[in-house]
Amino acid sequence: MNVKLTTIHTGNFKLDGGAMFGVVPKVLWNKMNPSDENNLCNWAMRCLLVEVGSRKILIDTGIGDKQSDKFFSHYYLNGDQSLDKSLAYVGLTKDDITDVILTHLHFDHVGGAVTNELTAAFSKAIYHVTETQWNHANNPNPREKASFLKENFETLQYEGVLNFVEPGEKIADIIEVLTCNGHTLGMITPLIHLPSGEKVLYGADLYPSHSHIKSNFVMAYDIQPLVTMIEKEAMNQRATEENWWIYYEHDLAHEMSKIALNEKNQFEAMNFASVDMLN
């Protein structure tokens, strides 16, 4: 079985450093993620294309372009990459995509899933998400309500292109559905099993960047930060034992790395690499 992994860049955006690192003091996180004069750090929106057999599977879709200029002005979009440009660079269009895995339905992950005309952007694709996350997004709590914009996903149900997946299920036989509940309920962190024996975990917002490997580096956005810490410790342990690669959706500088214990017996990112090396 031939499997190809390709990074799909959809542009960058800025978020408050304190929001991205929670209670961790700025003196610690600013060394790794320098902030500007407004305390904003620049973040990638890096999706992943998995080609296996006749299937072309896109994991997440970026922020899209449906919202108002005022909305986007809060996030200082930058960079010359876009979803369409990145697909075109590898000779594809949205119509070539057969599956879309939505790790969760926050706007920076699902914005590209639906067009400005509120139709499914990937007209021939099935969209995979957990039912837990779907129900959570459609009945949001006050803390997350601003991140769940129904115009980004509501039409997927009306068009009949949704597929609810369960933990442990496999998509195209190689993408294992792992779920986490600390950041938001029912978030998928897909684990890709390559024919070579290598495994790649798409970190979503459990590991938005390599700086978030440490269990106490938890975003203020997370609805259950203590749960995130527990989930991350367990994932760090398994990733180390099984020698996984971690793919970072929001890390501006690094696509992926391994996780290992350092001399202080703490988990940290090591052996940074590009996903191309796995093809």
Features from the language model and the residues they span:
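Conserved beta-strand hairpin/beta-sheet module of binuclear metal-dependent hydrolase folds
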Residues: V3, G11-Y89, T189-D205
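Active-site metal-binding loops of divalent metal-dependent hydrolases
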Residues: T10-G11, T61-G64, L105, T132-Q133, ...
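Residue-level marker for buried hydrophobic side chains located in beta-strands
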Residues: I57-I59, I101, Y127, V200-Y202, ...
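Cap/insert and terminal regions of metallo-dependent hydrolase folds
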Residues: Y76-K85, L191, S196-N279
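Metallo-beta-lactamase
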Residues: N78-Q81, S86-L92, D96-D108, S123-T179, ...
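Active-site glycine- and acidic-residue-rich loops that bind
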Residues: H106-V110, L178-P190
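Metal-dependent catalytic neighborhoods of phosphoester/phosphodiester hydrolases
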Residues: G111-A120, K258-A260
